[in-house]
Amino acid sequence: MTWFIDRRLNGKNKSMVNRQRFLRRYKAQIKQSISEAINKRSVTDVDSGESVSIPTEDISEPMFHQGRGGLRHRVHPGNDHFVQNDRIERPQGGGGGSGSGQGQASQDGEGQDEFVFQISKDEYLDLLFEDLALPNLKQNQQRQLTEYKTHRAGYTANGVPANISVVRSLQNSLARRTAMTAGKRRELHALEENLAIISNSEPAQLLEEERLRKEIAELRAKIERVPFIDTFDLRYKNYEKRPDPSSQAVMFCLMDVSGSMDQSTKDMAKRFYILLYLFLSRTYKNVEVVYIRHHTQAKEVDEHEFFYSQETGGTIVSSALKLMDEVVKERYNPAQWNIYAAQASDGDNWADDSPLCHEILAKKLLPVVRYYSYIEITRRAHQTLWREYEHLQSTFDNFAMQHIRDQDDIYPVFRELFHKQNATAKG
C-alpha cells in the first residue's frame, strides 16, 4: 500500500503568496475601490470583507504577440464554408455597447469585464485605515495605550514563501544531508579503498571486484536519493507584533440628535463614528471612548444607546461641550491623558448659543485637548456655528473642521482628519 503525506505549508491556502503580491502591486486601485464601496454599505456592515473591482486595463501586463502586419496562411479545423481569399463578414448584432455588464463597450463586439475578487475583513480594515493615526499623541506619565509594531523575531519552521530565508534553509539542508549520509559515505570510502587494493592485486579477483562495484553503486544510489532540500529544512523569517506603549488616550464622540437632524443626516454621522470606532479599536489598545448625545440637553451614554437611541429634541450645542468639560475635569487629567474629540452636527443651533460654544472651546476645551475635530453634515449654507468655529480654526492648531455634503464625502473627510503626521504639532 502506498501512503502520501502532504507536507505543504500552504496546502489549504496555496495562492497566499500570489495574493499578497497582487495586493501590493495594485494597492492604489484597491484602495480606490474600497473608498467607493464603503459608501454603499449599511451602517452595521462597515467592517466585513468586500468584493473589489479593478478595471481590466489597470491589471494588463506586457506580452509578446504577432504584429498586425505581414502575410499569413492559416488552416482552421472544421472549416467547410470558406476557401482561401474569402472575406468573412463581421457578425451582426450583439456588438459593443449592447451588453448589460460593467465591461467597456467595443466597436468589434469584444470586450472584458472588470476584474472582481474578494478581500478578507482583516485585509479590508488594514487598507481602510492605512497611514492613519491620532494626531499629536504625547508620551505622558502613565502608559496604558498600546500600539503594535512589527519586528523581526528570528526564524520559524512555518510561514509563507515570500518570507523564506534561503541561507538558513540551505544551512539546514546541508546539516541534514551530512547527518543522513555520513555513515554511508564512510562505508563507501572503505569499499572504494578495498576495490582499489583488489584491482591492483595479483591474481585478479573478478568476483570480489564485481561484488564491491555492486555495493558501491548501491551506496551511491542511496546517497543520491537523499533529497537536496526538504520541507524540514525550510526556515522563514519570523515577524511578530510587539506592543509599543504610548500614552493613554480618550476620545469624546459628540453627536447632535436634535430634530433638525433628519434620518439620512444621522446615518451619515453614525457612519463617521463607526469608522472612528473601528480605527481606534484596530490601531490602539485600551483607548477609552466617551459617547455624548445632545439636543437641548446632553447625556453621556453607552455605545448601543449612542448609535440606536431614538431620542430627539431642540438644539443647544453648548450643552454637549459643557458636559465634556465636566467629564474631563472629573475623570481625565490632561497631564496624564491625551484627550481627543470628534463633534458631528448639521450646524443648526440656537443663534445665541453659538458664541457660547466658541467661548467654551476657546477657554476650556481646546487648551487641554490634543485634537478637536468638527464635522458639519449639511447641504445648506453654513450658519452661525460654522462661522464661530472658523475663528477657532485660525487661532488653534489643534482644531480642525470639515464639511460633509453627502455619503461620498465621509471616508475622504475621515482620512483628511486623521492622516498620519510626520511631526507632532503640539508638545
Swiss-Prot record:
It holds the Pfam family DUF444. Belongs to the UPF0229 family. Keywords: Stress response. Residues 79-90 have a biased composition (Basic and acidic residues). Induction: Expression is probably regulated by NtrC, which binds to the promoter region of the yeaGH operon during nitrogen starvation. Expressed in nitrogen-starved cells shortly after sensing nitrogen starvation. It appears to be continuously expressed for up to 24 hours into nitrogen starvation. The keyword Protein transport does not apply. This is UPF0229 protein YeaH. May play a role in the adaptation to sustained nitrogen starvation. It comes from Escherichia coli (strain K12). Residues 79-110 are annotated as: Disordered. Residues 92-102 have a biased composition (Gly residues).
